[in-house]
């Protein structure tokens, strides 16, 4: 899989291949070739999650299109994208995948976008998804989405939790609430200690260690 223009060019120069053909990278970023040619803009990398393959297999039975975890516009390329922001202020609260994608899309439409994240790092639960072994490429989504937002003028504030009074002072045209979800601990039958039920966040953040335990 070709990861970058630099990799493609290096393999051409080495004689490893005579030409380069892109599959999934072009789905993740349809402007891959143009960005490689001009050197402008962040190329959004395929994170090798195979959602494209799985979704095309599943959706074929219902006559629908494939999907891409990196590019939410796959299958919606003809959807109108009105440039009607006119510099109006939009506040996006939460810089997980939804918040990052919303901020970039709104900036494309001409809005003045400010993105707020109460944690010190953007990415939301993607940061947890990238934590297990061999899942580091998942973090490419966060890196590339944040870079694209900054390129398009989105102002990103981390470690900042907005109060209602602060929002009123900003007087935004629209507020996008993208604060994510909270994990639920299901109830089980039989005898068990509820305190022994942990969420994926407990484990992946290292708050709870299960080494040497029966799971």
PLM regions with names:
Residues 1-93, 97, 101-108, 112-113, ...:
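Flavin-dependent oxidoreductase catalytic cores
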Residues 9-19, 26, 136, 145-146, ...:
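C-terminal structured "cap/appendage" subdomains that terminate the fold
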Residues 21-22, 159, 177:
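Short beta-strand and adjacent tight-turn residues that come in two discontinuous sequence segments
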Residues 81-88, 128-140, 199-207:
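Short, contiguous acidic/charged loop-to-helix segments that flank catalytic cores in large enzymes
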Residues 92-158:
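Beta1-alpha1 glycine-rich phosphate/pyrophosphate-binding loop at the start
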Residues 158-169, 185:
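A conserved short coil-to-beta-strand element within the FAD-binding core of flavoproteins
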Residues 172-174, 178-185:
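Glycine-/small-residue-rich beta->alpha transition segments that form the dinucleotide
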């Amino acid at each position: 899989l070709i990861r970058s223009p630099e990799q493609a060019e290096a393999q051409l120069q080495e004689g490893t291949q005579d030409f380069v053909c892109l599959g999934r990278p072009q789905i993740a970023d349809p402007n891959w070739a143009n960005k490689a040619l001009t050197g402008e803009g962040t190329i959004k990398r395929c994170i090798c999650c195979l959602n494209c393959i799985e979704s095309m297999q599943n959706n074929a039975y219902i006559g629908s299109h494939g999907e891409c975890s990196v590019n939410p516009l796959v299958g919606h390329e003809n959807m109108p994208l009105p440039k009607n922001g006119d510099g109006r202020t939009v506040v996006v609260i939460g810089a997980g995948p939804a918040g990052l994608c919303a901020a970039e899309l709104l900036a494309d439409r001409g809005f003045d976008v400010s993105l707020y994240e109460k944690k010190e790092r953007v990415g939301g639960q993607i940061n947890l998804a990238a934590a297990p072994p061999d899942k580091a490429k998942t973090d490419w989504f966060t890196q590339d989405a944040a870079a694209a937002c900054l390129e398009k003028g989105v102002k990103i504030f981390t470690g900042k939790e907005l109060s209602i009074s602060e929002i009123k002072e900003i007087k935004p045209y629209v507020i996008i609430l993208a604060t994510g979800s909270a994990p639920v601990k299901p109830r089980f039958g039989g005898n068990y200690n509820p305190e022994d039920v942990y969420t994926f966040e407990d484990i992946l953040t290292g708050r709870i260690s299960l080494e040497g335990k029966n799971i």
